[in-house]
Amino acid sequence: MIIVTGGAGFIGSNIVKALNDEGYKDILVVDNLKDGTKFINLADLDIADYMDKEEFIASILAGDDFGDIDAIFHEGACSSTTEWDGKYMMDNNYQYSKELLHYCLERRTPFLYASSAATYGGRTDNFIEERQYEKPLNVYGYSKFLFDQYVREILPQADSQICGFRYFNVYGPREGHKGSMASVAFHLNNQINQRQNPKLFAGSEGFQRDFIYVGDAAAVNLWFWKNGVSGIYNCGTGRAESFQAVADAVVECHKDKSLTVEHIDFPEHLKGRYQRFTQADLTKLRAAGYDKPFKTVAEGVTEYMHWLNQDK
């Protein structure tokens, strides 16, 4: 059996899809479906069982036996960069992850987990998986950073796989439940379908991020699991592209020459807490042996727009 926490969420459900595509169906999805809309992410996928997150944590703490577990992909977390309840964030992202890690270590079960590029904070270069380059801007980034630090202490003594992925700006299918935290491409597509011009923050041509297509992020997870590689790795494309490039790709897919991108004022509450530039350094990822290419914004957004608008 393979366990995917956060399996009804964005990246988690795409990992389930990638596993299905390779013939794996004996999958236990762990999630919190209080937001019932997330079920749609699983509706076309094959899983063996579902378990509520709170029940799962209780079972982990009790040391319950789940049988033969081939791997745990731990994607379950609060991923909101605008959530400032530190106790909630640390319970969800730090404490829960520690408990699950030790459960895996005791059983020598491969443990692959979601870290984040938010660990790097507001820097504009050297996005390298080393302590001197890390200084998160928000409590979400701090919760991910602290767990990475915890893993670093354990890795030298671990005799089973522990692998963390610092996701950069992930976008693509199955993110619709994320609301305001969904990708720019998702929101621009919605605006156009509502007969509006797509809107970007003023200065967006100067904001550059490393946008990675979710299918590529899932492929990284599966490759590392199959190859048994441990460590903490950036999961991005190694290319920074502008929000304007995302908007241009979305508009291009809609084939409507009347569309023009509007620029709106930058929100006050995000000033000083917003990464203006991200670009994954892939040196460590490539050195580990991962050599597959990553989609450009134009390629990934085109595939995503076809998926989003397939029923229209």
Swiss-Prot record:
Cofactor(s) the record lists: NADP(+)
CDD domains per the UniProt record, alphabetical: ADP_GME_SDR_e (cd05248)
Molecular function, one GO term: ADP-glyceromanno-heptose 6-epimerase activity
Segments crossing the lipid bilayer: none
Enzyme class: isomerase
Catalysed transformations (reactions): ADP-D-glycero-beta-D-manno-heptose = ADP-L-glycero-beta-D-manno-heptose
Enzyme Commission no: 5.1.3.20
Chain sites annotated for binding NADP(+): 10-11, 31-32, 38, 53, 75-79, 92, 144, 170, 178
Keywords in alphabetical order: Carbohydrate metabolism, Isomerase, NADP
Signal peptide: none
Subunit structure: Homopentamer.
General function of this protein: Catalyzes the interconversion between ADP-D-glycero-beta-D-manno-heptose and ADP-L-glycero-beta-D-manno-heptose via an epimerization at carbon 6 of the heptose.
Domain notes: Contains a large N-terminal NADP-binding domain, and a smaller C-terminal substrate-binding domain.
Annotated HAMAP family: Heptose_epimerase
Name of this protein: ADP-L-glycero-D-manno-heptose-6-epimerase
Taxonomic source organism: Photorhabdus laumondii subsp. laumondii (strain DSM 15139 / CIP 105565 / TT01) (Photorhabdus luminescens subsp. laumondii)
Gene name, Swiss-Prot/TrEMBL: hldD
